[in-house]
From Swiss-Prot:
Record PROSITE patterns: RIBOSOMAL_S2_1
Gene Ontology terms: biological process: translation
GO function term, MF aspect, one: structural constituent of ribosome
Xref: Gene3D superfamilies: Glucose-6-phosphate isomerase like protein, domain 1, Helix hairpin bin
Protein's UniProt name: Small ribosomal subunit protein uS2
GO cellular component entries: cytosolic small ribosomal subunit
Protein origin, superkingdom: Bacteria
UniProt family annotation: Belongs to the universal ribosomal protein uS2 family.
Keywords: Ribonucleoprotein, Ribosomal protein
Length: 239
């Protein structure tokens, strides 16, 4: 059975690409036609790629691979967190901080600091500090939770990065490729399929398109790990 149907993709608007003047010629094999100055993605190709991506991700999960979901644009942010948590993955959905992968030692120290501050907040230790000092600590806690909260349970570098919007997440792509971490990428018509191992050509701007793709990938991870793609009430922790 197909991972996703043409009707589901049409309803989600997954076929709408960018204006023709903004295209990347390397995406031509995934483009069906142009209408009113906008490229239309070939959803038959997308369905094939989704099937391949599902099998690839399921196999990776079955072998114990760890996943990091990345998507910081407004329309993807909530979905990225939701689906990453549902399958026990980690996520970045606010801003990619330089060195999140390539300077992992420093990043892990910041994550440890976040955990320390959360323990202090839970125990009431921050509330017991002088007012000014407590305010400084709470601001630091809020900032770390915003940018690193999705990485809190990522104990080491991920084995796979699942990406929404390759063009926006350039730094994430560069860091993953530098470390030879494979990328599963949603690719709009302005993207470069050569910069990922597992391409999924589709509209990466529409919320429903992003939701459709990420939910299927989360299903694949759950199926690989647990033998079922049912929702798991995970906390984002990975070994």
């Amino acid at each position: 059975m197909a991972v996703v149907t043409l009707a589901e993709m049409m309803e989600a608007g997954a076929h709408f690409g960018h204006q023709t003047r903004r295209w990347n010629p390397k995406m031509s094999r995934y483009i069906y036609c142009a209408r009113n100055g906008v490229h239309i993605i070939d959803l038959v190709q997308t369905a094939v790629c989704m099937n391949n991506a599902y099998k690839w991700v399921r196999s990776a999960a079955r072998s114990g691979k760890r996943f990091l979901f990345v998507g910081t644009k407004k329309q993807a942010s909530e979905v990225v967190a939701q689906e990453a948590l549902r399958c026990g993955g980690s996520y970045v959905n606010q801003r990619w901080l330089g060195g999140m992968l390539t300077n992992w030692t420093t990043m892990k120290a910041r994550i440890d600091r976040l955990k320390d501050l959360e323990r202090m907040e839970a125990s009431g230790a921050i509330a017991m500090r002088p007012k000014k000092e407590g305010a400084v600590l709470r601001r630091e806690l809020d900032r770390l939770q915003k940018y690193l909260g999705g990485l809190k349970n990522m104990r080491r570098l991920p084995d796979v990065v699942v990406l929404v919007d390759q063009r926006r997440e350039t730094n994430a792509v560069l860091e993953a490729r530098k470390l030879d971490i494979p990328l599963v990428s949603m690719l709009d018509t302005n993207c470069d399929p050569d910069l990922c191992e597992v391409p999924i050509p589709c509209n990466d701007d529409a919320v429903r398109s992003v939701q459709l793709v990420l939910s299927r990938l989360a299903d694949a991870i759950n199926e690989g790990r647990h033998g079922s793609n049912e929702q798991r009430g995970g906390d984002g922790s990975e070994g």
